[in-house]
Structures are given as C-alpha cells and as structure tokens.
A protein has these predicted regions:
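Structured interaction patches on ligand/partner-binding surfaces of diverse proteins
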Residues: 62-112, 192-238
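Basic K/R-rich, polyanion-interacting modules in nucleoproteins and related proteins
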Residues: 1-11, 93-137, 230-245
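Aromatic-rich carbohydrate-binding modules that target alpha-glucans
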Residues: 2, 10-53, 61-81, 136-182, ...
Length: 246
C-alpha cells in the first residue's frame, strides 16, 4: 500500500521534515515542500496486517540529524484495511502533548481494554476516515460519535449518529464511503451513552468543515486527529482560601 504524509509546519532555513513508522527512527521518510510550510512525502509499505494500528510521527531534520520530534507518548495512528493496493493519504497537524494532557492519563480516562480486532476499516474504493482524540469518556460510560450534514452522517439527527471505535486509548476513528458524503461536509463530534447509543452531549466546538475534491479509486483520506472537548469534561477545581495576616 502507498502512504502519503501531509502536514503544515513552518521550518527554518536548512530544516526538513520526515516521518518515521512504528518507532523506526533510523529510517525517516523525508518530505518535501515548495514554501517551507506545507510538507508532503510518500512511501510504500508492505505486509501490513489488516485491523492492526500502525503508529508514526514527524521530526525536524537538519544535516541528516533529527533536532526535534513530536511527543512520543501519543504518536499518530491509523488502521489499514483488508484491501491491497490502496493509497492512504494521512493529513496531520504537528502533535505535541494535548492541551490538557492530564486528562489522557488512566486516572481520568480509565483503563483502555483493547479489542481482539479493529472493525473500522475502509469499506469502499474511496473512503474517508475521521480521527479524533477524546479522553474521559470511559468514566462517563460513553463512546464518541459523529453527526452532520448529509444522509451518511444523519442530517444532524442525533438518532442517526455514526458511532466511532476506540482503536487506542482515547483515539477514536470511523471510516465511511466517500461516495455517500456531501462536500463541503459539516459535522460535529458527539458523546453517546455506551449502552443506549443515545447522544448525551455535543462537542463544545463550531461545526467542523471538510472539503475534498476529486478522490481517485483506491484512495483513503484520513482527517487530522482533532482534539475533542465536551463542556462536562471541563476542568473543575475546588479549594479553600486561607487568609494570611502579617
């Protein structure tokens, strides 16, 4: 299968970007740019088992040496499907620690129980994979979903929400047939009850917008891994103020 990495990152003169797969930091896939901001590069990957998450991360290189790397605690991930000869287009943001990284610890997010196999895989020749980062759902007995414009996303009807699958702790994904989606696509992430599947909360974010033109047969586009926040998960601090007199 072919992998294409896309990321925006402003580099200094003499710096380049590279991507490394599965922790293999000694063999980076070097990217190229025309403006020093938008970077892209491709590579072939063989013998990737279907449904098993593949991790990767980006680094900044100067004179062949890596001088900065993304946070290693939460690499980018995706799950290849059973179909061969696919072209995965991985659209990314630079990934440092999440804004509220403490929420991603097991103390706040609970223990992740990995499934025997990942169900979320490319269902068609042209597919879109939605990716999101969202902690704290286990403690509230919830799972992530996506709802939006068009029949495939329920036409904003929360009863028709598309449920997502957790493929790593706090990392959620779902893959849909691109032909069933209407572009430009507006959507939002929602928190659903893990038992009833009913929507309990909409994310605290404006409608998200996805614009894609002219996908080719065999292409699978993966959105950047967006951080999803819900009002109910906002930080709550309690304490006592003690006056000090001099």
């Amino acid at each position: 299968m072919k992998l294409t990495f896309r990321i925006e990152y402003r580099t200094a003169w003499g710096e380049m970007l590279g991507a490394t797969l599965c922790g293999n930091d000694n063999q980076p896939i070097m990217l190229s740019t025309g403006d020093g901001i938008r970077w892209e590069g491709s590579a072939e990957m063989t013998d990737a088992p279907a449904g098993i998450p593949i991790s990767y991360r980006y680094g900044v290189y100067r004179d062949g040496q890596c001088i900065r790397r993304e946070s290693g605690t939460m690499p980018h991930i995706f799950c290849p499907g059973k179909k061969r000869n696919c072209h995965y287009i991985l659209d990314d943001f630079w990934k440092d620690l999440p804004q509220e990284s403490y929420l991603y610890s097991s103390a706040f997010s609970g223990d992740y129980q990995s499934a025997n196999s990942i169900k979320t895989m490319a269902p068609a020749d042209c597919s879109i994979t939605f990716r999101a980062l969202c902690p704290c759902l286990h403690h509230k007995h919830q799972q992530l979903g996506v709802c939006g414009r068009g029949a495939a996303l329920g036409n904003w009807d929360c009863k028709q929400t598309v449920l997502m699958e957790e493929i790593q702790a706090n990392e959620w994904t779902v893959t849909l047939n691109a032909a069933s989606l209407e572009f430009p696509l507006e959507y939002k992430f929602v928190a659903c009850n893990a038992d009833t599947k009913e929507v309990e909360e909409w994310e605290a974010h404006n409608n998200r917008l996805l614009c894609i033109d002219g996908m080719k047969k065999g292409e699978i586009y993966l959105t950047p891994e967006s951080e999803v926040r819900f009002t109910s998960s906002a930080r709550k601090v309690a304490g006592t103020a003690i006056p000090v007199f001099s």
